[in-house]
Amino acid sequence: LQGRAAIAWFARSLIHIVGMKMPPSGLFALPLQALSWLGNQGTRAIVAVLLAAIAVPPFGELARPYVTHAIFLLLCISFMRVDVAMLRAHLRRPALVLAATAWTTIAVPGLVGLGARLTGVDAAAPDLTLALMLQATASPMMASPALAALMGLDATLVLITLVTSTALVPLTAPVFAYVFMGETLSLSPATLGLKLAGILAGALAAATAIRLVFGIETIRRHRAPIDGFNICILFVFASAIMAHFLADLLATPFRMLGLAVLAFAVFFLLLGTTMLLFRNAGRERAMALGMMVSLRNMGLMLAATEGAIPGTTWLYFAMSQFPIHLAPQLLRPFAERLRAAPRPPGENDQALISPARD
């Protein structure tokens, strides 16, 4: 009941933000101005969220029961802002989208699962293998298009691939859970698929209702306060994930360091491999796809499992937040150099690159 009350309160707040006239006046002027300021901070706010989440462990303990609700609201906001016209434009040339979708939803989890089995990691460290498999089977992060746009990359390509990949996850995740996760996962594969489908379908239905009531132009006009609200929800999720970070760091520093190194290694391995595979599509599009594939929506998998995962899996999820939150700051200079470099003959990304947002 508390969870339902919380999600209802946040949903009403989101609807109020969308429905508010701009500029705001009266009682809600100051809160909306604060949300707008927060939403305009860009990648700085993403880093600040992680640091703030680490700094307040007691809030993380309070936030843990609401992880599923936070993920649901983050999905609602993302679906609410999808540009249907952009989706249709990329669907006219689906070959690249289909290849990227197959790579991120089928090839990546298949390779991770096979690698763990062939090297014996699945038997030696089943909880860590579960973490890697949940990461690999997850859809890309819903924030991937926005992060691509922030770096001046092709956000529309990322958006359509994100949508197709997310739609397939309720079908592909149970298969990989059955083949590679075994009894380590407390849920049955069928239950996992149904929970994923329910979360995604519910978020899509709520987002569609908001779009129908207010219209896409109103949502665009309120971009800044919605971004600020999104950051607040992200803080709830990050706090829940990082609740035990400081205590675990003090208790087992070398273990935490090892998990952090692994999290960054997985991130850069997925990024680099994807860029190599799709280099013929253009360097900027290859990097955009690399960003999307390396930023996995582990929160969705955490929501589907309702947090019923082993301690090591929780710790890996916590350490994986560092490459996720630091990626825009780390990779933006590289993306700028990539765009400024001379193009090889025949490579043309013009008119396909979404402009960067400050």
Each language-model region and where it sits:
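Alpha-helical transmembrane segments of multi-pass small-molecule/ion transporters
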Residues: 15-358
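N-terminal amphipathic/basic-hydrophobic helices that include classical n-h-c signal peptides
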Residues: 1-21
